[in-house]
């Protein structure tokens, strides 16, 4: 049975072909070993998207050999998959997770223009036109990254009230009804929301220009998807939005079929 692994900056998610799945912190190697040990004797192929570098990849390779007796297949950015033409001159510098997002978008949107938005530790945007040409993208700090940066620089971040406001995924509690905060925590939340909303507004405007006014399908993935989804729907209620929380794992399924 095939095992799909999405090793991201913060979390490593996995899914078996039968639908079983799990998640561990990417720096929790022992947790990953415990999870994968339960799959010994079941896995016959491993397909991986990793942005964690060679040291992690080698450890994963050794673990798969030890537990499953097979080497993992690491996804690599390639020209021509579903006719996609990456914008980068050096393919090895395009994040493989972003490339797989484009693969997933092309497989679903077909000949429609696509915008892939990743709302994780970084906020990423990639555009794909109707001819499958990657028009490039944007990378900015994600919601939690901006909030963490503020928390590390100002004294109030160590206050009990601020720490209680932090949720387990790193995001702050929802803002109050006013657009402006009346406490430090609410001010940080409202300010970050305003920054992200402005970013997304520019995405919609610039994508419209790049696509010559043609409508596009927006694919949204990442841990902050609910927060970003609300902003996108507020900015353009008519936006065609596809929620793809496991876009990398879904794309790995497609990629594994081409590897067979």
From Swiss-Prot:
InterPro entries: ATPase_NBD (IPR043129), Type_III_PanK (IPR004619). Its EC number is 2.7.1.33. Its main location: cytoplasm. It catalyses: (R)-pantothenate + ATP = (R)-4'-phosphopantothenate + ADP + H(+). The keyword Ribonucleoprotein does not apply. The keyword Protein biosynthesis does not apply. One of its GO terms (molecular function) is pantothenate kinase activity. Substrate binds at residues 88, 95-98, 184. Pathway: Cofactor biosynthesis; coenzyme A biosynthesis; CoA from (R)-pantothenate: step 1/5. It is found in: Cytoplasm. ATP binds at residues 6-13, 121. Keywords: ATP-binding, Coenzyme A biosynthesis, Cytoplasm, Kinase, Nucleotide-binding, Potassium, Transferase. Its cofactor is NH4(+); K(+). It comes from the Bacteria. The active site is at residue 97. HAMAP family: Pantothen_kinase_3. Belongs to the type III pantothenate kinase family. Catalyzes the phosphorylation of pantothenate (Pan), the first step in CoA biosynthesis. Homodimer. This is Type III pantothenate kinase. The gene is coaX.
């Amino acid at each position: 049975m095939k095992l799909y692994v999405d090793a991201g900056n913060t979390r490593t998610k996995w899914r078996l072909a039968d639908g079983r799945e799990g998640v561990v912190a990417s720096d929790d190697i022992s947790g990953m070993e415990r999870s994968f040990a339960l799959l010994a004797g079941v896995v016959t192929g491993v397909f991986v998207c990793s942005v964690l570098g060679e040291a992690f990849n080698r450890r994963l390779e050794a673990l798969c050999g030890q537990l499953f007796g097979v080497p993992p297949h690491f996804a690599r950015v390639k020209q021509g998959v579903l006719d996609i033409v990456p914008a980068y001159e050096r393919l090895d510098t395009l994040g493989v997770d972003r490339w797989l997002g484009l693969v997933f978008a092309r497989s679903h949107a077909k000949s429609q223009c696509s915008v892939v938005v990743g709302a994780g530790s970084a906020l990423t945007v990639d555009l794909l036109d109707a001819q499958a040409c990657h028009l490039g993208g944007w990378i900015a700090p994600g919601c939690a990254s901006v909030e963490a940066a503020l928390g590390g620089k100002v004294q109030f971040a160590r206050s009990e009230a601020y720490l209680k406001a932090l949720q387990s995924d790193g995001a702050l509690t929802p803002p109050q009804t006013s657009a402006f905060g009346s406490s430090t925590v609410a001010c940080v939340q409202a300010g970050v929301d305003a920054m992200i909303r402005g970013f997304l507004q520019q995405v919609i405007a610039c994508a419209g220009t790049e696509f010559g006014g043609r409508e596009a399908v927006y694919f949204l993935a990442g841990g902050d998807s609910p927060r970003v989804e609300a902003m996108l729907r507020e900015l353009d209620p008519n936006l065609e939005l596809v929620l793809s929380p496991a876009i990398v794992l879904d794309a790995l399924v497609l990629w594994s079929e081409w590897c067979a």
